[in-house]
């Protein structure tokens, strides 16, 4: 018999019994038997122990550099971004994922509204964006940008070894007590901003309960298991990328495969084939790219058991084109940032 809530009334009570997402992640990481926690399509794999070590090391650096509550993050889907996200949440701070595609005015406005003093980012990422004509460093006159590469260089070999041993030897309860700050499930965990296409970007505050409940709902409805491999290609400034393809699998002990560019469908399909990816979530615009790309083959997509579209209306030509080429249906999710983000999804007939 299922122990999961089955009614609306049950879901009114159940979320209060959940752990914050970073605590759920910690417990899963200590128990997980999967080969890796996070990988990128180029082949760099991070084990659960190394991921935990990274979170513990990085959280200490954030404590030293950023005493304020709201912490900015300017990164694409990546292992470093996932580690930084969990580290920030574990400190009881509010994570502000900034939309690096929104333009200078919208980004500056978002950082100012959220009173972000420090933004953690990557020199490699900033250089790539500069090549595309975006000088992101000039977008934040009132915030200081801190580079992950510089922070890594500051961490001694001894600190890495000692922290790795703690990650391996200490039980989850002791790590939580030693490193994590106590939070209320009603505290604001994250602020996600709209794109600003209809005026100034609007910040949406999501509590720990919002995120934990929606992640658990998604895991239940998608029947996600640690035998799955989730393709994490949506950016974490997007609610679906943040909650459904990053935090949900991490909290459930499900491996994720990251790629920074959701439009790079040929590389992503190669990653699906390489890692036997089982769940792909994307916007209809991105899914259409799989159907029209000659580099994305039928064979490369056959490990997938579930493809879900969200963020915009799934047009019949996209759904039919995907099913015709890959012989698999596309299911449609609906939600908004305010619903953390998932509100509904259609599922396979049972």
Where are the language model's segments positioned?
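Conserved structural elements of the adenylate-forming
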Residues: 51-58, 171-174, 185, 204-225, ...
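Conserved AMP-binding/adenylation subdomain of ANL enzymes
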Residues: 212-229, 237-278, 293
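Conserved AMP-binding/adenylate-forming core of the ANL superfamily
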Residues: 35-65, 69-86, 103-108, 161, ...
């Amino acid at each position: 018999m299922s122990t999961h809530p089955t009614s609306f009334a049950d879901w009114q009570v159940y979320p209060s019994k959940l752990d914050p997402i970073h605590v759920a992640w910690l417990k899963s990481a200590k128990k997980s038997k999967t080969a890796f926690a996070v990988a990128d399509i180029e082949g760099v794999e991070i084990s659960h122990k190394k991921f935990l070590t990274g979170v513990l090391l990085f959280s200490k650096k954030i404590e030293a550099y950023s005493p304020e509550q709201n912490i900015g993050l300017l990164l694409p889907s990546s292992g470093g971004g996932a580690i930084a996200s969990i580290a920030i949440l574990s400190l009881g701070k509010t994570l502000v994922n900034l939309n690096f595609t929104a333009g200078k005015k919208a980004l500056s406005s978002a950082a100012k509204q959220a009173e972000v003093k420090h933004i953690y980012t990557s020199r490699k990422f900033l250089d790539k964006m500069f090549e595309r004509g975006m000088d992101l460093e000039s977008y934040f006159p009132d915030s200081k940008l801190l580079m992950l590469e510089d922070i890594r260089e500051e961490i001694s070999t001894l600190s890495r070894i000692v922290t790795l041993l703690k990650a391996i030897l200490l039980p989850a309860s002791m790590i939580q007590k030693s490193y994590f700050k106590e939070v209320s499930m009603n505290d604001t965990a994250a602020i996600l901003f709209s794109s600003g296409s209809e005026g100034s970007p609007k910040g949406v505050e999501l509590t720990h309960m919002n995120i934990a409940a929606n992640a658990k709902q998604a895991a239940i409805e998608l029947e996600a298991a640690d035998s799955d491999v989730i393709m994490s290609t949506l950016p974490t400034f997007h609610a679906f990328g943040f909650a459904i393809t990053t935090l949900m699998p991490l909290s459930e002990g499900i491996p994720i495969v990251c790629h920074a560019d959701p439009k790079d469908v040929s590389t992503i399909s190669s990653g699906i084939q390489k890692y036997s990816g089982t769940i792909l979530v994307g916007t209809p615009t991105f899914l259409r790219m799989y159907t029209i790309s000659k580099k994305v083959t039928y064979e490369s997509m056959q490990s997938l058991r579930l493809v879900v579209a969200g963020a915009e209306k799934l047009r019949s030509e996209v759904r039919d084109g995907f099913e015709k080429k890959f012989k698999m249906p596309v299911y449609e999710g609906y939600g908004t940032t305010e619903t953390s983000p998932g509100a509904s999804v259609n599922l396979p007939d049972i």
